[in-house]
Amino acid sequence: MASDIEIARGAKKKPIQEVAARAGVSPENLIPYGHDKAKISAAHLAGLAHNATGKLILVTAINPTPAGEGKTTTSIGLADAMNRIGANTLLCLREPSLGPCFGMKGGATGGGLAQIVPMEDINLHFTGDFHAITSAHNLLSTMIDNHIHWGGEPKLEAVRTSWRRVMDMNDRSLRNIVSGLGGPGNGSPSETGFDITVASEVMAILCLATDAEDLEARLARIIVGYTSEKEAVTAADIKATGAMMALLRDAMLPNLVQTLENNPCLVHGGPFANIAHGCNSVMATSAALKMADYVVTEAGFGADLGAEKFLNIKCRQAGLAPDAVVLVATIRALKMHGGLGKNDLGKVSYEALESGLENLGRHIGNLRSFGLPVIVAINRFTTDTEGEVHALQAYCEKLGVPVSLCTHWAEGGKGTEDLARGVTALIEKGEADFKPLYPDDMPLLEKIETVAKSIYRAGRVETTRAVRNQLAAWEKAGFGHLPVCMAKTQYSFSTDPALLGAPEGHVVRLREVRLAAGAGFVVAICGDIMTMPGLPRRPAAEHIHLNRQGQIEGLN
């Protein structure tokens, strides 16, 4: 079979105006970026308010292998399949980050015959949203330094400044740096660092804002540091909000592209799920629900991260409630969770598969605890045997969970029609009764412990007195009602990436907490997770190049 990029390059794309018409967007409400991508105008979004609301389908997964388990591919295949069976469906995905594209994972536009296009554009610069978000974030950094340099009011202490810089690249050498060297004319020396753009609070704010007014209000609430009296200083205090909004004027609008089968897809925002909240924008999801009968969206990494945050953060803030959840599982990941080495995942091992099924069972139980009906999607690989597939199907049937074998990578939407029928049947039963994991008024540390014990099955949360005092101070300052955003490894229920399967009684080490007052959550950084990733020993960038025709090769 051809490579992903070769398949995408051969796609028979329709003009974006035709794709927009399928989604009910008129030409005057379309802002084209070339022939195959566009933004949807604010006027169109505002005019959707009185439309009926569609059904929301969340796609999530078990804990993944480093290569991912095809969650995005399954989301695309499902949306194509639902349109094939006559269910008017819109797809909502996140924008890829350059870091993983050039790092370990590669692109994030699906694979095989389940892709969104234009693949190269979406994976790289797209419509410039990430550039705008990075620029807005770093403009605030610059204005903070300038405020300190000129002694502006309120008096912000350099040592109490908490705002770091960002860039959309994996670069471990920038995690911790000293800036302002070279004498008084070059700023005040201070320890700081860079995070990846997808971990930026500006990214989270853009993805959680309901409209331009809410976006500006959230930006204004960003806390950048404190005075000597420990009074919070915000982006509004240093008069940065207006200029940040100017940079984000176009980035706040959802992007429209198409699948290989010419179905419309909104791609907007891209926070990581292991170090941020891992969901596409509220504006895109809310708009899609007013534009189609069904909306398929995904949450990053496994259900312990992306889905937990989708349900406890995004749904809580935006008033959303999924009608069904698709849990993607692969035979190879289950065997890895059962103890098989990553180089042996193509080998048959019923013992490893049976042991690894506990990971799937844990995720099913967790999702059901939110009051949501679940269907398991088996993303089939060519190395899967009939016996292994039957063993997985039997396990799901034993738990009373519907299961569907999917071959969308090889067959596109046709290979996921059974899943599409299963999802619509599940929704028609009306069994969804969504409820978040914890109430707003629960203390912050207790919220962290609730996620750790209920979702991760940890025995306890271990942290420092400084972290406890910081959480107590934020509660006293009026932030105790906020949800928590757990930052931890995506490979395990625990904070140890090597502890696979379904561990219980482990210790979650809470190392640091950060207040994202504008986004509206408290980040709990656990274990050794980094908010600026590094490149692997053999980064994907080594294999990416331009051919003699000026086409990009190696981007998968």
Swiss-Prot record:
Example of a GO biological process term: tetrahydrofolate interconversion
Enzyme Commission code(s) on record: 6.3.4.3
Signal peptide (from-to): none
UniProt xrefs under CDD domains: FTHFS (cd00477)
Highest taxon of the lineage: Bacteria
Residues that hold ATP according to the record: 65-72
Reactions performed catalytically: (6S)-5,6,7,8-tetrahydrofolate + formate + ATP = (6R)-10-formyltetrahydrofolate + ADP + phosphate
Gene Ontology molecular function, alphabetical: ATP binding; formate-tetrahydrofolate ligase activity
Functional pathway: One-carbon metabolism; tetrahydrofolate interconversion
SUPFAM superfamilies xrefs: P-loop containing nucleoside triphosphate hydrolases
Key words, A-Z: ATP-binding, Ligase, Nucleotide-binding, One-carbon metabolism
Similarity field: Belongs to the formate--tetrahydrofolate ligase family.
Protein name: Formate--tetrahydrofolate ligase
